[in-house]
Amino acid sequence: MAKTGKKFRAAAALVDRDKRYAVAEGFQLLKKTVEARSTKYDQTVDVSINLGVDPKHADQMVRGAVVLPHGTGATVRVAVFAKGEKATDATNAGADVVGAEDLQKRIEEGFLDFDTVIATPDMMGVVGRLGKVLGPRGLMPNPKVGTVTMDVAKAIRDAKGGKVDFRAEKAGIVHAKLGKSSFEVEKLEANFNALVDLVMKLKPAAAKGVYLQGIAISSSMGPGIKLDTMEIKTRHG
């Protein structure tokens, strides 16, 4: 939905575009912008983090995963590539679909009714054949974010319990979900702090200059709210 119309303008009028808000103040303001839209839709709350990195260089890539303490508020559908005992573990842990070559074939035929993919290491030969399908959608399992693992049960629990995978895009910007607009401010802040703490710890040694260059939060139907990077650097160092 386009961010236009009277309700969006009313929400945007609450935000000083030239101000960098303290974190607590920023989330309180975000809740006010949601109220100004007066929609029954439970919007997603997002964060954009502008980093001083060039992801085109492998030694400057920022990538990771964090389990948000209060989850994302979203229902996550999990597909698992596994065989034998690990397939049974995946089913028992609540995976939405489990398979091997049969699942590969379904995906090649157009099945994409899932939000994340987990695989045991021995299945990566099968999963690798789906690179052109899963890769562009950000669904390819990766050991760096815990989606290539023998402990499929834990990976499934994490995925369904609020795990967020993130990576710096071409311009060095990390986009991630923090929860829903119905969340209490304290829960949104806690999720934000968990994510930012990890992003700051992942600063590449090869990154030069200012690492945290800008950060903003918004609801899916609301204006962006810029936050004070100095406060965040002091808190998360």
From Swiss-Prot:
Parts of the chain that traverse the membrane: none
Database matches in InterPro entries: Ribosom_uL1_bac-type, Ribosomal_uL1, Ribosomal_uL1-like, Ribosomal_uL1/biogenesis, Ribosomal_uL1_3-a/b-sand, Ribosomal_uL1_CS
Pfam entry (one): Ribosomal_L1
Any one of the GO BP annotations: translation
Coiled coil: none
Domain of life: Bacteria
Annotated GO CC locations: cytosolic large ribosomal subunit
Subunit structure and binding partners: Part of the 50S ribosomal subunit.
Family as reported in the entry's similarity comment: Belongs to the universal ribosomal protein uL1 family.
Name the UniProt record assigns to this protein: Large ribosomal subunit protein uL1
Taxon lineage: Bacteria, Pseudomonadati, Myxococcota, Myxococcia, Myxococcales
